[in-house]
């Protein structure tokens, strides 16, 4: 008898199984990378210890904070025009970023002995988290999907990005305005043009991770993979920022204990904007923009899918004011859901892609 293969066949894994597999995989990766670099994995300046400590601390913090968020009635407002399977998520607490982001920041600061660059990146991370919190709070207060206006959100992102760039301008070496190309012994000098690019990267990366946060465990897992790889790449030149990346990666893993399918809490803009800001800030500080571009492949594709959807809709708009859609729904992960993929299939596939991108980055990195 002929049988039609559905997108969900062949995937027999639970949300907790997927999250556990990711945590185990990143733990083994951290140990391996420390071993390759001749680092003691159980010292503060490593990948393994910050990853492990912040995973545990974030997971434990969630058991206290998630019930509090439930009691405060911070339930997520679900879009009615989205995938119908998401309607059952209505009421799930959001703002999860308020516990796992601070856990990572505190852990990184302590383990790095409050290194200046870690304090700077932490300040940018918390600033973007604050923007997200304001947006999340407005959504909850108004009981709709509309938070602060896009213009206000963008203005705040630009302001904090400008402040970080000013600090970078006066506290980092002059060659920071040259972009290192890892596969050739050459740096692309940008001069003053570096600064508008830096501001753009901070804003774009935070919004890209924000768009990726649409399925249980998706943003948390893919960012955890990117952060650990970025930490390994920057380790030779900035051990303190390696610790920061490992701590934030671990905190994402701890958050997945509560955000894996079916999620008990969402990170909200509080978490997603902070994560994107952190990735961009570390890359700018360590001249790792090429690595960031590769590691952020999933986030950029998600963003491009939204841009393509909007552009195509406007270009095909007829006299009735309605246009055609390129995708069933943007971002891409929602299109895949509406095409018959399960949430777990989308998330596991994106984890695999994120891992491949991380391996590519590590392969070309000048260790």
Swiss-Prot record:
Alphabetical GO biological process terms: cell division; cell wall organization; peptidoglycan biosynthetic process; regulation of cell shape
Principal place of residence: membrane
Keyword presence, DNA-binding: no
Swiss-Prot/TrEMBL keywords: Cell cycle, Cell division, Cell inner membrane, Cell membrane, Cell shape, Cell wall biogenesis/degradation, Magnesium, Membrane, Metal-binding, Peptidoglycan synthesis, Transferase, Transmembrane, Transmembrane helix
Topological type in the membrane: Multi-pass membrane protein
Pathway note: Cell wall biogenesis; peptidoglycan biosynthesis
Pfam families: Glycos_transf_4, MraY_sig1
Catalytic activity: UDP-N-acetyl-alpha-D-muramoyl-L-alanyl-gamma-D-glutamyl-meso-2,6-diaminopimeloyl-D-alanyl-D-alanine + di-trans,octa-cis-undecaprenyl phosphate = di-trans,octa-cis-undecaprenyl diphospho-N-acetyl-alpha-D-muramoyl-L-alanyl-D-glutamyl-meso-2,6-diaminopimeloyl-D-alanyl-D-alanine + UMP
A single GO cellular-component term on record: plasma membrane
Molecular functions (GO terms): metal ion binding; phospho-N-acetylmuramoyl-pentapeptide-transferase activity; UDP-N-acetylmuramoyl-L-alanyl-D-glutamyl-meso-2,6-diaminopimelyl-D-alanyl-D-alanine:undecaprenyl-phosphate transferase activity
Regions crossing the membrane: 13-33, 49-69, 95-115, 119-139, 154-174, 183-203, 215-235, 237-257, 281-301, 347-367
NCBIfam families in UniProt: mraY
Job description of the protein: Catalyzes the initial step of the lipid cycle reactions in the biosynthesis of the cell wall peptidoglycan: transfers peptidoglycan precursor phospho-MurNAc-pentapeptide from UDP-MurNAc-pentapeptide onto the lipid carrier undecaprenyl phosphate, yielding undecaprenyl-pyrophosphoryl-MurNAc-pentapeptide, known as lipid I.
Record family assignment: Belongs to the glycosyltransferase 4 family. MraY subfamily.
Official protein name in the record: Phospho-N-acetylmuramoyl-pentapeptide-transferase
Lineage: Bacteria, Bacillati, Cyanobacteriota, Cyanophyceae, Nostocales
